[in-house]
């Protein structure tokens, strides 16, 4: 299956598989959002907010589906 991934606020610099801010990722059927983090090489603690198809995802064990649109945001920082 394929999911569209958008990485915000510089999170793409943490990914070993990123080809920019928006890209498609092939995953095995039944993959979870945690599996996506592993595939991308992004530490889970670097992702504060995950949105799938416009809805905030609270359960990182939730399964993704083919065609899902995933947006990942790091914690907000600054002053």
Predicted regions and their residues:
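Ubiquitin-like/PB1-type beta-grasp interaction modules and other compact soluble beta-rich domains
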Residues: 1-78
């Amino acid at each position: 299956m394929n999911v569209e991934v958008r990485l915000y606020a510089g999170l793409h610099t943490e990914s070993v598989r990123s080809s920019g801010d928006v890209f498609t990722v092939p995953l095995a059927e039944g993959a979870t959002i945690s599996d996506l983090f592993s595939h991308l090489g992004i530490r889970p603690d670097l992702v504060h907010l995950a949105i799938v198809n416009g809805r905030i995802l609270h359960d990182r064990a939730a399964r993704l589906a083919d065609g899902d649109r995933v947006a990942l945001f790091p914690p907000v920082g600054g002053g």
